[in-house]
Amino acid sequence: MVEKIKVLVVDDAAFMIKAVSELLESDPGIKIVGNARNGLEGLEKIKALRPDVITLDMDMPVMDGVTTIRHIMIEAPVPVVVLSSLFSDGGITFEALRLGVVDFLPKPSGAISHDIHRAKQQLIDRVKLAAVVNLQNIRRVKLNRWNSRELLAERYGFQSLDYLLAIGTTLGGPNTSLRLFSSLSPKLPAAAVVVQEISPKILPAFVKKFDEFVPWKVEAARDGAVLEQGVCYISSYENTITFQINSNREICLRVDTVSDKPLDTLFASAADVFEHHVIGLLLTGIGNDGTEGFARIKKKSGVTIAQEVDTCVYPNLIQCAIERGVVDRVVSENELPATIAALMESAAHVEM
């Protein structure tokens, strides 16, 4: 008999505890083992009840969500799914993802939500996925805020735009993207486009804070934006990104919502426009999206890289691409910045 997933619900609102508990336990594979009304009580119950997953509100008395996450990751690591109405607060959203929560879902409509049942299946699915993550790979990102003088020196190296770094990731992606761009030089002759699993409601606040803590200039992908060297464009997985050459012979982004395989669409369009000047990168995630797009990159003589499976929070996305034989290099997360830089440098020397 398969054991049920044990969940602890942490929220200061009695209504939300009841609603979340009822919708999760409507699935026969999930059992609510307890609840807590603030972070301090939640920590005590994590240690006593040993849940497989916790759902966590961010706005609570005694100990707020961010402080609670910090303590959880040090004292009693467990997968955390945030369910909060504070998605518009850039600092809180960013900090929660930086500290290593596996998912961040906005409450459907405010702190006391009467339509939370509309989100029932999504929350059930995310809790089930959280229960099988590799806990060893859940860790906080250590970042330093860049001052304006440092950013000017780093961001504006007057490089040409010769390459595209196209990055695809689903669940677990925001944390991994932060680590990558905190170490990757913005002086590479490239632009970067990232499609990742993050709620469109959260994305603007996340991008704003992301830009403050990495040397790259970071923007939300917008339709018609002309690609610039040293800029990272981030899009939600709910959008699709393609590339187009405009009347001024500039490469611009097209943002739409028509494809059910956003990563395949991203990689295929990148290959068609940039050809051998594209590096495709698959990071942590679930599903098989990206595999067909990687095949197109290889066909156009670009390079495909996958994060090493053992360093992924969710390895399934990468395993599918490796099994299909469309990955040129498998690289540990720590080695990704150096590998990407070396590939661009070696390609530039070959073409001189």
How does the language model describe each region?
Residues 31-33:
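Short beta-strand elements in bilobed, periplasmic/extracellular small-molecule ligand-binding domains
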Residues 2-8, 14-25, 29, 40-41, ...:
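Conserved acid/base catalytic micro-environments in cytosolic active-site loops
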